[in-house]
């Protein structure tokens, strides 16, 4: 029994130290151009074969990391399920309010002390981060070419007493519409929430067509 406890403690400490050190590398988040079917996409860390930042937690944003926002996109940062940042202006930005401090940012002494405090916090979670930070990109371009139509003819009675008309007809309706996300914050809060990778318009089109 003692051996099992000791192994658990060693593993937790190793996980806490290793995970925290891996998360010290600054990230660069970006989102490739989204096609007309994608409404929301989770931000990806830019890595290459030469990158040393390959073991960090996917849901941790290190202090000082870069975040790029392209035209036609809106970016939000979600921490512990709550939106803490939103940006709809294109350009590159630096994340400097993270509660996951980096030894590569700010005052070296302060950052190191905060990092060791973070290691202590992770130890209480068995070596895991105990934190969730995500970057989401919203497609703010107009989503066009959405077709709709009545699945069955709609019966309709036409009556005109002046000419003695009283007939039953069947009416069909079809067309094309477009829409766009005008408030990404409300869309995240009320519609998509946290998504693993992408939220596509197929997930909402049925509801939209029903309301027609």
Features from the language model and the residues they span:
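N-terminal hydrophobic membrane-entry segments
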Residues: 2-212
